[in-house]
C-alpha cells in the first residue's frame, strides 16, 4: 500500500477511536492543582502589569492634588465593575462558593476585552513591559479559558463555555464626566488594577480551598 494511503488509514482510525480512547482514560486528565497553578500565574501576571502600569502612569502624569480629587470624586473614581455583584468584604468573599468566585472572576475578565483598546497609547508608551493592547487582550483571553476550564471541572468535569459578558467599560468611557484624556486613561488604569486585584484574590481563595498546602502561595 502507498505511503499516502497508510497515512489516510491511520488518521481515519485515530479519529474513529478518539472518543473511546478518551472514555478509557488513554488521555490523562490535567490535575486540578495544575489548572489552578496556571490560572493563578496568569492572574498574577495581569495584576502585576495593571499595578505597575497604573503606578508608572500616575507618577509621570498625575499631580498629587489631582490624584486625591480624582479618588474622592465618585463620578470619576467609579468603576464599571461595580455593576458586577462582588463581595464587599473579606467575610463576604469567604462565604462565596468556589464556583461563585470563578464566575465573578470570569465576568471581571470579560468586561475588559474591549476597554484595553482604549489604553493602547498607555501600553505603547510604557517603559516597563513593552506590551501592546493586543498582548493584554491575549492575556485576558488566556485567563478566561483557564477559568472556564476550572468551572467545567468543578461542575461536571467538562470544559465550560458561555456567552461573553457583553457590557464593558465602553459605557464608563462614553459617560465619563471628565473630558481630559489623561484622567480618562488614569481612571481606566485605576479600575483595571482594582479588577485584576479582585480576580487574583478570588482565584487565590479557590486554590487555597482546593489544593492542600497552597494557601501560602
Curated annotation (Swiss-Prot):
Entry superkingdom: Eukaryota
CDD domains in the record: somatotropin_like
Disulfide bonds listed in the record: 79-191, 208-215
GO annotation, biological process: animal organ development; growth hormone receptor signaling pathway; positive regulation of growth; positive regulation of receptor signaling pathway via JAK-STAT; response to nutrient levels
Keywords: Disulfide bond, Hormone, Metal-binding, Phosphoprotein, Secreted, Signal, Zinc
Keyword Secreted carried by entry: yes
GO MF entry, a single one: hormone activity
Residues found modified as Phosphoserine: 132
GO cellular component term, pick one: extracellular space
Major localization listed first in the record, in broad terms: secreted
Record keyword Repeat present: no
A Pfam family assignment: Hormone_1
Subcellular location: Secreted
Leader sequence residues: 1-24
Chain positions recorded as Zn(2+) binding sites: 44, 200
Family assignment from sequence similarity: Belongs to the somatotropin/prolactin family.
Role, per record: Plays an important role in growth control. Its major role in stimulating body growth is to stimulate the liver and other tissues to secrete IGF1. It stimulates both the differentiation and proliferation of myoblasts. It also stimulates amino acid uptake and protein synthesis in muscle and other tissues.
Protein name listed in UniProt: Somatotropin
Species in which this protein is naturally found: Callithrix jacchus
Gene symbol of the encoding locus: GH1
